[in-house]
Amino acid sequence: NSMLDANWGRIINIASVASLRGFPYVSGYCASKHAVLGMTRSLALEVATQGVTVNAICPGYVDTDIVRTAVSEIVSKTGRTENEAMQHFTESNPQGRLVEASEVASTVSWLCSEGAASVTGQAIAIDGGGTA
């Protein structure tokens, strides 16, 4: 059965804080994430009366292998220390740290729950207040 046939469903799109604001030098990436958010909002309105919610999560920099590799690249190419390179990724988070993958997963889990039945068409920033 489809979500519409079941009159229940949860669609959670993975966007980024780049869907909420612009960033220099990554205009293509920002444009694609803005598109995800536009699709999320439009689809949420299309299925709002059919028991389906549609939301987007918008994480900031998450502590993943990709970020750790980027830190290593910054160190090797610039001579910065690891802490200096990491600061590039943590300075946009008022909490001064990377977002944990478990925090993103917990947000997705909540959006899938009955407790989030009235949450639809939203962009949920998971960035330690960086977009506040």
Predicted regions and their residues:
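Alpha-helical segment proximal to the catalytic Tyr-Lys
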Residues: N1, L45-E46, A117
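Residue(s) in the substrate-gating loop at a strand-loop-helix junction
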Residues: S16
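C-terminal substrate-recognition "lid" of short-chain dehydrogenase/reductases
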Residues: W8, Q95-I126, T131
